Amino acid sequence: MKKKILFGLLCATAGLSLASCGGRDTSHTIVFWNTMGDNLQQVLNPAIEDFEKKYPGWTVESSQIGDYDDVRNQTISYIAAGKNPDLVYCYPDHVALYNKSKQVVDLNTYINDPELGYTEEQIADFVEGYYDEGSAYGDGAMYTLPFSKSTEVLYYNKTVFEEQNLDVPTTWEEMEDVIRILKLRFPESIPLGIDSEDNLFITTAAQKDAPYTSATGDSHYLFDNEQNRATVQMFKDWYDKRYMTTKYIYGTYTSGLFVSTSSERSFMSIGSTGGASHQVPDKNAFEVGISPIPTFEGTDLKCISQGPSLCMLKQASEEKMEMTWRFMKEFLLTTEFQAEFSMASGYNPVLKSTFALPAYEAFLSNATGTEEGITALSAQACLTLSETNSFFVSDAFVGSSTARTEVGKIIQNVLKLGTSLDEAFATAITNCNKDN
């Protein structure tokens, strides 16, 4: 059995063939590139062993290739060299780049196969927002399946909220009232921290149903509109009153401000469910609560879908692609594996049936706002969001990654540098069009 964890480039140069790495024949080896550290590789190893027992003669080589950007960059290099890995962690904008050379497998070929594919009931078991990400490319194809997901939630200091008799805000309008009150009662505080300016812009645009981007049409970049400008101006007003800060302004993740017990602290933090363990103070100095992020009055709640999906890259061998599909479907996207991986990683399962598994129900029963139970509390919040179908994904295309970065910069520049709305939005549109 060949299971190998690598922490850099798989070979010295991208021009080397996969088969030449160590002089091995990889014709019956599924090469799987991901970002899993040792603890998650230990969760993955039994799935690999089970696959290799069921299909003698086939092996899986799992390799940690740094972070998500490293996986993307190395995959692009190997595609250019004509040496595709079989299965890779991906985000939607990564897939759009890979598909410039038409190297991503349309999974509909397998999903709809009467023997290899999914039934309607099995498809319905996927959390809808996670599953829909695979077809967000504007061409009708299905390029990815979800693997492990996260979203953003509102972490709040439950102890302070109860002491101050404050309700947790469910709308941005309520948020403004709460942060105003907290600032009055705790003058040195910065009541609200935001971990991602990019997500803040994209999510609030989705909540307002305001144009952001489109994978089709003559213009991809639609985010310069009055609705989005009004939202940025709202956050600018809050920042000027020291009601809020962001990762860029604070200099690091605002969870550090949230878990602080000094006078300069925050009482709410909008961050990833995947980072729930970082939102708990030392020695459980206060209890943490988790709530959905606010939305605007009169709008539906929408929460961004994040975390890695899986995509298959084209191979000369049809048999190898089929075996890659079998490994993915039969061993990674199962209720049992999803439960184990979620409990170990803190990311959310992608199958709804996982939440009914006795072991996972026991895990959720330990949900508390403490160090011991925060991961389960985070997963519990995500279960609620999945039941209300609140997750969304943005269109993916070549240039969508640039758009994401540029809208985040709008918030950064307007808040911290005092850039005018006209200049900030115009610069962002110009930079997007340069890279299109």
List each model region and its residues:
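Extracytoplasmic/periplasmic substrate-binding proteins
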Residues: 35, 48, 200-207, 233-326, ...
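Mature extracytoplasmic/periplasmic domains
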Residues: 43, 112, 274-278, 308-401
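Hinge/lid segment of periplasmic solute-binding proteins
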Residues: 93-151, 204-206, 289-294, 369-382
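Short, solvent-exposed loop/beta-turn-alpha elements that line the ligand-binding surface or hinge
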Residues: 108-126, 210-230, 281-282, 295-303, ...
